[in-house]
Amino acid sequence: MFFSRRNLLKGSAASLAATALGSSSTAFAQQSSAPTIRPLTGKMTYEEVRNRAREMMIPRCYVCPECNGRGPCVGQVPGFGGMGASRGFQANYDSLAAVQLNSRVVHSVHVPDTSIDFFGTKISMPVIAAPTGGTTYNMGGKLTEEEFVNAICGGCNKAGTLGAVADGIGDPLLVYEKRLQTLKEHGYKAIVGLKPRLQKDIIERMRLAEEAGIIALTIDLDSAGRAARATKGQTVEPKTFEQLKELVKASKLPLLFKGIMTPDEAELCINAGAAGIVVSNHGGRTLADTPGTAAVLPRIVDKVNGCCFVMVDGTLARGTDVEKYVAMGANCTLAGRHFVRAAHGGLADGVALFANKMKNELAVAMVVLTGAQAVKDINRSMVVIPDYKA
């Protein structure tokens, strides 16, 4: 039996409006090869998750109707805002909003497959939680480290995708170890995000991540600009090309360099042997006046030309946002602020609800609007990119 477009729209609308995640299995390996579009079941609605998150997170985050860098959080770093006047944060939102989807209504797609392969691990959609640290100084300390890891990783795994553990710039090594221990105890599938510390400190943290069974590593190269916030006695620094090569060789795990915003630096990362890059301005939190990631992604993808895995972040809130980034050439995306809010509003169920919401929205966009059977079928003909010329 297949879904007609009308039934698909009705079913997806009901699933998004009605309820949160309920009884999906926590066993990651049991995810189907072609996720179906089904109503979400449970007791908590997405609006309830947002309301609870707002109650918990003010004044760190106000859970605005649109997370666009223009709310009360402007300039709040630490916190949820962007640096300075939050123009980098705003540029992420504006550049993504400016990309438009081309509607295609004559095709034979009925049930799309939103899943992708992420370095040998099948995940339900091209969305992974962004590594996020600072449960105290960024989020207000309303969740313990264990609660936050359980919420992010447990919820993402319930939805069939990967969670994340961060090496926060203001966190001592003990906190990082505690996060990894929680991940290991529960057998969560996740990635780990590291800061550009001294080489020996990064490699030490790589070893700990390997022991915890993580899937891939990222290093936030752009966090070198946040040295003033590093824990006393610890160092973050810019990395040379030779240092990048050393880090790639230091681990057998896939290593992606994050914070790449220009084609030439993408090429440097490839030449250093990186498994991938993450196009990111750190949510506008490291430099106040960067362009938005959607504005630079197409040219970076052109430069990479399939030579490495390309990820991107920047104000992802909906499944249509995911399709836009993938259409511009990203292999996968990272979502940060929205997952953190979902964790505070509903713990693992809230995170799974948000993840499944995005997956359902992506599926609707693929089948009803753009006619893509699988994620690999999403391409640039499906989007209108302002000011872009190949």
Task: Show where each model-derived region lies.
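N-terminal export signals
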Residues: 2, 7-29
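An N-cap/entry alpha-helix motif that binds or orients negatively charged groups
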Residues: 36-124, 378, 387-389
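N-terminal functional module of multi-domain proteins
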Residues: 86-172, 179
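Conserved, mostly hydrophobic/aromatic
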Residues: 129, 156, 219, 277, ...
